[in-house]
Amino acid sequence: MSTKTIYDRLRRYGLTAERACGLMGNFQAESAMRSNNVEDRSGMDDDRYTALADSGNYDFLTDYGKHYGYGLAQWTLASRKENLLNTAKKRGVSVSDEAMQVDFAVWEISNQWPKLWELLTTSHDLYECTRQVCLDYERPAVNNIDARYRAAQDFFEQLAGGSDPDPQPAPDPQPSPPERGDPIVRVLQTCMAYDGYWPADQIDGIKTPEYREAIVKYAADVAGC
């Protein structure tokens, strides 16, 4: 699937040109627009990893506790990878199928991030679109929004034929920490990406079983579960 095909598919969902390109700019930063891309720290070949995931003989959901990002959006949380894999199975396609992944990303945003989805379908601010996808949907450990925005600009020029609507974007604010009452899935995503938001006495090691248990306990408390 070409970048033009991905762009057209996103536009058919009602995304503005700026929002489609903002989302694609994030995909470019996450995976270089490769739907079979597995996170580099896995040390695994993309095709080999995908074949294992499709075979059912590999722990695709958690990567045996190592939690590798995968696909266009580098889905990492077990719950999200499970939904991605189930969607692929229902369609009878590989988990690397580009059309399926685009549809899945749209489904996630429209159902789990309704405010972001509203922005996706109404905003004509390319920088804001790119920034909000990064902060709300992707939540990377390193924001690198400038690189995402440059990629979004390139897509906008190539696919929408427009000029940069915001050539001098304002400095990017840091995303806010989780707040009491937030949905637990959002708290979990924030905690997984930004260790700095954790109370010091609740961090015990890095990505250990105790650490993951602390994440769930802390997120449940903040979400009021």
What are these regions (language model features)?
Residues 1-33:
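Export/targeting segments at the very N-terminus of extracytoplasmic proteins
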Residues 14-24, 35-42, 115-125, 129, ...:
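Surface-exposed patches in mature extracellular/periplasmic domains of secreted proteins
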Residues 3, 16-20, 65-68, 94-102, ...:
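Solvent-exposed, acidic/flexible segments
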Residues 175-186, 190-225:
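Short acidic, glycine/serine/threonine-rich helix-capping segments at coil-helix boundaries
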Residues 5, 31-121:
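Peptidoglycan-targeting cell-wall enzymes and recognition modules
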